């Protein structure tokens, strides 16, 4: 009987500790830091302006979803919607090829883009001759990196 009572007390203490830790964890996390199951629009635009007859070839995928490839003519775009997973580890990468140039980049990476794509939850990329530009409103573009 004494052993049974000790096990019950031990389980009760373990359960109480788990609840206390859960309360502490929830109180530390601010709602603005939670980006679980949020939806984002991601867009990649062919921003070449030299009237090239060569398309911008793009292929995008995550570890769970292959979006396939597209051949984008000037001003064409490739867009998709995604939702972040529970661990905020959602990650889509794209490989872009134009003429002899080839570049892989992170089109969406949850830890980086949860804030960067706010407040509209829009992550847009404009691919130009001199590099890759990012915008979260499709108006203000900032060069993120070169080819």
Model region roles, listed by residue range:
Residues 2-87, 95-147:
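Intrinsically disordered, low-complexity segments enriched in small/polar residues
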């Amino acid at each position: 009987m004494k052993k049974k009572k000790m096990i019950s007390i031990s389980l009760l203490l373990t359960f109480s500790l788990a609840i206390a830790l859960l309360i502490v964890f929830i109180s530390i996390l601010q709602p603005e830091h939670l980006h679980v199951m949020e939806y984002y629009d991601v867009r990649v635009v062919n921003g070449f302006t030299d009237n090239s007859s060569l398309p911008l070839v793009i292929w995008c995928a995550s570890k769970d979803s292959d979006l396939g490839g597209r051949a984008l003519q000037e001003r064409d775009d490739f867009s998709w919607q995604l939702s972040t997973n529970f661990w905020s580890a959602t990650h889509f990468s794209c490989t872009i090829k134009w003429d002899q140039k080839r570049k892989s980049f992170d089109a969406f990476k949850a830890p980086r883009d949860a804030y960067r794509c706010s407040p509209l939850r829009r992550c847009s990329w404009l691919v130009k001759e001199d590099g890759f530009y990012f915008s979260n409103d499709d108006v203000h573009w900032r060069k993120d990196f070169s080819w």
